[in-house]
A protein has these predicted regions:
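Solvent-exposed, non-transmembrane regulatory segments of membrane-associated proteins
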Residues: 2-96, 195-222
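Charged, alpha-helix-enriched surfaces in structured cytosolic catalytic cores
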Residues: 28, 32, 36, 148, ...
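A small-molecule sensor/coupling module
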Residues: 38, 167-208
Length: 222
């Protein structure tokens, strides 16, 4: 596969080029790219085309902490309050990558709304479907061990999540030995799942080989 490229075009604009398998894919690829960059810009606090976003409000963060994070990690009220200032509400578009395999996550991600599919890639490049994570689940656990994640994750629909950076979630987990033990077990289970030989469902080979056709878009990011 050919990775997309980007270059500054002046005037706070950027030109992004995406390799296509066929010119017929132009419209669909452009629509997907613009949708994904809309979500990505808001996650990073960028003002795409001058737009402002206040999705991660204190009220939303507090609600997500109370209804999802606290039950998942069995947090006390004190722990919840200590994490709220360091948590951020984010959204991902359908089919967008939420977690990359082989990278060390910088945060734990708790699913508030929507679902994601965990995947792993075999030596021959085939993508294998692993488990489905739904509301109330979490990913990015290997941020605590500073190890690369064995699995990738992509959104099956619009996903709303709460992210808590490693240094802040780590402080809470290390104070709770039973929680640390349970999270360690989950990490081990997911690693076993991603390396299981069996006969899992495959969702493709090495992927389509792009041709020289390129899609270009020029988002304005401030």
């Amino acid at each position: 596969d050919v990775a997309p490229t980007s270059a500054a075009a002046g005037g706070r604009e950027y030109r992004v080029s995406i390799a296509l398998k066929s010119p017929a894919d132009d419209s669909a690829a452009r629509a997907t790219f613009l949708r994904w960059i809309w979500y990505a810009a808001r996650r990073e606090g960028l003002h795409l085309n001058g737009a402002y976003d206040d999705f991660s409000t204190p009220a939303r963060v507090q609600m997500a902490m109370r209804t999802v994070v606290a039950p998942a990690l069995r947090l006390s009220l004190t722990d919840q309050q200590s994490l709220i200032p360091h948590a951020k509400m984010v959204r991902y578009g359908t089919d967008e990558v939420v977690q990359y395999a082989g990278e060390v996550p910088t945060a734990m991600t708790f699913l508030i709304r929507g679902s994601v599919r965990l995947t792993t890639t075999t030596e021959d490049g085939s993508v294998i479907l692993l488990s489905l994570l739904e509301e109330g689940s979490f990913l990015g656990l290997t941020t605590l061990t500073r190890q690369p994640s064995n699995s990738g994750a992509y959104a099956l629909e619009e996903v709303t999540a709460l992210e808590i950076a490693r240094e802040h979630i780590e402080d809470v987990v290390l104070r709770t030995p039973l929680l640390l033990q349970e999270l360690g077990r989950i990490i081990e289970d997911r690693q076993k799942e991603s390396s299981r030989t069996g006969h899992p469902e495959r969702v493709g080979g090495q992927g389509p080989q792009p041709n020289p056709g390129l899609l270009s878009a020029r988002p304005n990011v401030k």
